[in-house]
């Protein structure tokens, strides 16, 4: 029985474009914040890293809090759209704040300014916006194929934006003057673009009525729960924990790739190569995302596709290490592209896997926690990306790196090689292992068989709204 279709092509594109706004924040922050603070503002990389790590202490609470608030929201716009819309206003303001540290302030005041701006951006506004955006996957369609398509559209826009930001920002800042004020100008422009696109994206889709989302299900009057109960439901779901771990590893991987700006500048002696490597990463990802929905259908599920993709990614990153020590930039780019091609399918169907993960909680616990379940996306992005950036700062500080020096010691160059060549390979191996155990689709099929739920009723009745 063919599943009911809920979305037009323009709904899918409109939804996917929302990750332009998300990556205006995320790609800009993770790729350039550290180099801005160390080289333009003159702050110590190790101290910045520590402040970022301390900021992450707030994230675990705020992710679950906002996920729970989305689940409890009932408005004319729906559950998630208000949080997506209004959360981004704060994102735009605090993004500019992170890149507008007044150079006239004393050193301590500069650290305080950065910490407050960064914490508000990540722990409050980005959390509310990103969880709501991700939760829309479950709230605007019940069709599993459309969910995979939404994920593909979303990450095509995400990686295109990331590519563009990584490719043009260095030159853009130089054209604006190359100093701290230039970074502020670029941040303002990016924030305005993000605000406009986020608004268009939110208004391009419509959440399904709750009656339709819950059609065919028995209403549970005792389904109300607080943050503590929501947390307990999450940790009981082993697949949620796996996805959280995988998401964190992905963002750690991304932080090390972002640290490539140091590797290109000091090891390869050409900072403009950072933009060229961005093409090698993002174009193959986009190509893989285009074909992900077709491959999911061909292999009758996401598990095999994701696992095989990451086997290819591990091979690619291992060859990048070899090419790096050979000193061959063309080979490094080629193998970087190979690794990215393997990573693409998991990026494209991740939200659909989370929807299946949410379904697993319903089948095992009898509770629906759409918004709370999607907290893993925001939690993983912020903890992984934040800790990754912090680790970059600590490693640079440990190696003796000083941002405003004309030359760097060999220990700093060795550390840059380790961060850019070896750590991404290690993270890919760990992700591959996690994906080898993440067969939530089969787990759900077995549970439905035990409960006597017909296979063709899965999406309409038990697939997460």
Could you describe each region identified by the protein language model?
Residues 2-464:
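Membrane-embedded alpha-helical bundles of multi-pass transporters/translocases
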């Amino acid at each position: 029985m063919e599943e009911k279709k809920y979305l037009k092509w323009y709904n899918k594109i409109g939804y996917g474009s929302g990750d332009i706004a998300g990556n205006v924040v995320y790609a800009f922050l993770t790729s350039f914040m550290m180099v801005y603070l160390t080289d333009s503002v003159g702050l110590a990389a190790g101290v910045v890293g520590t402040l970022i790590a301390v900021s992450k202490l707030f994230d675990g609470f705020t992710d679950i809090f906002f996920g729970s608030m989305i689940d409890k929201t009932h408005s004319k716009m729906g559950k998630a759209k208000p949080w997506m819309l209004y959360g981004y206003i704060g994102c735009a303001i605090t993004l500019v704040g992170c890149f507008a540290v007044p150079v006239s302030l004393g050193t301590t005041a500069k650290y305080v300014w950065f910490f407050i701006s960064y914490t508000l951006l990540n722990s409050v506004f980005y959390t509310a916006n990103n969880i709501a955006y991700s939760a829309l996957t479950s709230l605007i369609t019940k069709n599993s194929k459309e969910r995979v398509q939404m994920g593909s559209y979303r990450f095509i826009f995400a990686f295109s934006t990331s590519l563009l930001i990584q490719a043009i920002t260095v030159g853009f800042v130089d054209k604006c003057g190359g100093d701290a004020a230039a970074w502020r100008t670029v941040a303002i422009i990016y924030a305005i673009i993000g605000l406009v696109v986020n608004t268009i994206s939110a208004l391009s889709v419509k959440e399904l009525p709750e009656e339709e989302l819950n059609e065919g299900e028995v209403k549970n009057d005792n389904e109300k729960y607080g943050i503590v109960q929501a947390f307990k439901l999450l940790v009981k779901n082993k697949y949620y924990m796996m996805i959280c771990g995988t998401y964190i590893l992905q963002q750690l991987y991304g932080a090390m790739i972002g640290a490539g700006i140091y590797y290109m500048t000091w090891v390869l002696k050409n900072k403009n190569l950072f933009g060229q490597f961005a093409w090698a990463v993002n174009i193959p990802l986009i190509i893989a995302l285009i074909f992900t929905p077709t491959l999911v259908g061909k292999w009758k599920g996401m598990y095999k596709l994701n696992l095989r993709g990451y086997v290819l990614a591990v091979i690619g990153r291992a060859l990048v290490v070899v090419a790096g020590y050979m000193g061959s930039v063309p080979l490094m780019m080629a193998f970087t592209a190979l690794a990215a091609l393997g990573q693409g399918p998991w990026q494209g169907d991740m939200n659909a896997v989370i929807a299946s993960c949410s379904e697993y909680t319903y089948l095992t616990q009898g509770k629906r926690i759409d918004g709370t379940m999607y907290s893993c996306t925001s939690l993983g992005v912020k903890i992984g990306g934040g800790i990754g950036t912090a680790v970059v700062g600590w490693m640079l500080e440990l190696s003796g790196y000083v941002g405003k020096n004309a030359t760097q010691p060999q220990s700093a160059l060795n550390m840059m090689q380790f961060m850019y060549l070896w750590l991404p390979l290690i993270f890919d191996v760990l992700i591959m292992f996690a994906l080898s155990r993440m067969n939530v689709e089969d787990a759900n099929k077995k549970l439905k068989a035990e409960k006597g739920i017909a296979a063709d009723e899965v999406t309409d009745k038990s697939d997460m709204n």
